[in-house]
């Protein structure tokens, strides 16, 4: 008897690729996106060390964290649509190998321009995440698609939450070049693993590259579900980014006065919120997304109210007299905010991946691009809110954004 082929054939039509997603492959997808997302979100604690080492002026130091994000946006627009045109395994592995090369260049860069170019291109090629997520959705059975997307999305959120403490610890022990070297090695090993274990997937769109790019506007106008969930995700991501931008400023102040290790532990505590992703996916698969989404946004509202109480003294809480209690409440607030954001993301992703299967990568790209913009706006707005009113101002901003998402749920239910 001949042994089965290592890569089972998967035909062109995406929906016929269902039932191919096994538990080990799901774990591989989740691990892959967890590693890749670190390329984008770990730069903030490295801004100071990199700027000093490469003699980057203070006025330009923000480029260290901004350019990977800008590159990612470019990759979303020009590289991700290729997943609806080219064989997905080869595209993913090639993109990730280029990312590893760019990270290695960043680790060895002798001047600031070379470093900034390298991290920008590393950000662009990190869009491999948005090839992997719709690929996992395409491989999953339609009845379990939400659960599959939730499991993979838990990897994304885990990577986001781990990236800053991971970067801080490695930079503190070995320097920033070692951190980028470790990332390059991880991405290279990951590319080899994906080449070995990912199945082939030939998309069936039949479009040209120019046609794919031109179709983005048409898809946005045509798909009401995409617009609904993308707007919701953008608002939620703005609140999520505002919280995590401001909390670092608050925790170094009295009565908390946390050092870098304390900040890392606080960030790790928020990882508990990622367990919501598989649960949210299963709820969506059972047809309860319309109920689950307001619950996710309600968790966000409760988390923000706790954060305002424990960090800004809302509702008369005596923070100075009970600093340990206040810190514990801030941890709970972080977990609730992470859980709400993960739930929103997972339910939105599931809905998007139930739309046109031949445009799945483009739909995911549009969805992510919109909420990515929301996250950037939230981070910038948090800085302004902090300058005006401190942590209380940041929490007020988060509360307004989360309330907007919740009101959107109520309006959507009223229309139906």
Task: Explain the meaning of each model-derived region.
Residues 127-140, 342-356:
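Intracellular juxtamembrane helix-capping segments at the cytosolic ends
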Residues 291-344:
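C-terminal transmembrane helical hairpin of 12-TM major facilitator-type secondary transporters
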